[in-house]
């Protein structure tokens, strides 16, 4: 079987279905693939293929996630759907499935439920820029006023988490009707309307290559007569020979110039997001740079030691801690390529964090790390992952 070539003729966007358990997220995912496949936008994927999602490991944490892809006239989409609530929490916090936008599924008969609220809150914390709502199972509600009340409740909930509740598209339908090919108005047509809303309301993300240059330093060596080389995988942007760079984190920020980019032992003029490269640096000694720092476009990122985080703490049976932790807990925080010790301060009113919780707290690191909001990290104790988190706000 030769692999199909991935043709990039449309902008790409990553989305996912979120919402309360049994409100129809997986059925909707199947309905989208089936409806768009009929219109020539990808392959139809059945419910049971999505539901038995494979397990993946991301930052030492096992997550079950199903990935499907499809196309509208406007975009190519990669779509994630998770079977369990804990998988969503882990996925959103570890950034395992980067979401540029989300489809919030709400059962019209139930209205917003606890996990509906939690997923919206997480979306806000991890920086999901836009949410579109699918009001599912509308054929199970006879009272039109009831549906209007639920819609109003969803808008208020979105607004309370700083999403534009009044402007958010809410599409009413039945994902099951679309899968079973009946009741076109609430079935197939609702899916077409939903995807139109997703196309228009979810903004096109900035591609990694269009962001400022950043490369986490993995290794450093000196080549006699040439200078110092830092190796790593370029996370974002483009680097060209002759451009200025900064070395940020751990110690005081230093400036240098890229005098060459190497890939597969060949010298290139430039490297871009996704490339594993060696970058030759002018006037930098072997000891001036170390793993844990980043090379970046000057003034694009700054080093910090204190931040607010949202984190998921592994349960005992996931290989996590057996006991809760309290303020003054001092694990290692693994950012990009390195562990840094930090101290946790829990918010007022939170006495402790139990294994299996997702929690908010403040961290103070012992050495500065180049960071910006939305940066993911693992929480480790002696090399063993006990949690994962995301920087939600930088303090100093």
Swiss-Prot record:
Stretch list, region G1: 19-26
GO MF assignments: GTP binding; GTPase activity; guanosine tetraphosphate binding; translation elongation factor activity
Enzyme class: hydrolase
Segments of this protein annotated with the region G3: 81-84
Cross-referenced Pfam families: GTP_EFTU, GTP_EFTU_D2, GTP_EFTU_D3
Stretches the record annotates as G5: 174-176
Record keyword Hydrolase present: yes
Domain of life: Bacteria
Disulfide bonds: none
Gene3D superfamilies with a match to the protein in the record: P-loop containing nucleotide triphosphate hydrolases, Translation factors
Residue numbers binding Mg(2+): 26
Cellular component aspect of the GO annotation: cytoplasm
tr-type G domain mapped to chain residues: 10-206
Region annotation (G4) ranges: 136-139
Subcellular location: Cytoplasm
Residues reported to bind GTP: 19-26, 81-85, 136-139
Entries under NCBIfam families matching the protein: EF-Tu, PRK00049.1, PRK12735.1, PRK12736.1, small_GTP
Function: GTP hydrolase that promotes the GTP-dependent binding of aminoacyl-tRNA to the A-site of ribosomes during protein biosynthesis.
Summary of subunit composition and partner proteins: Monomer.
UniProt similarity note: Belongs to the TRAFAC class translation factor GTPase superfamily. Classic translation factor GTPase family. EF-Tu/EF-1A subfamily.
Protein name: Elongation factor Tu
Organism listed in the record: Pelagibacter ubique (strain HTCC1062)
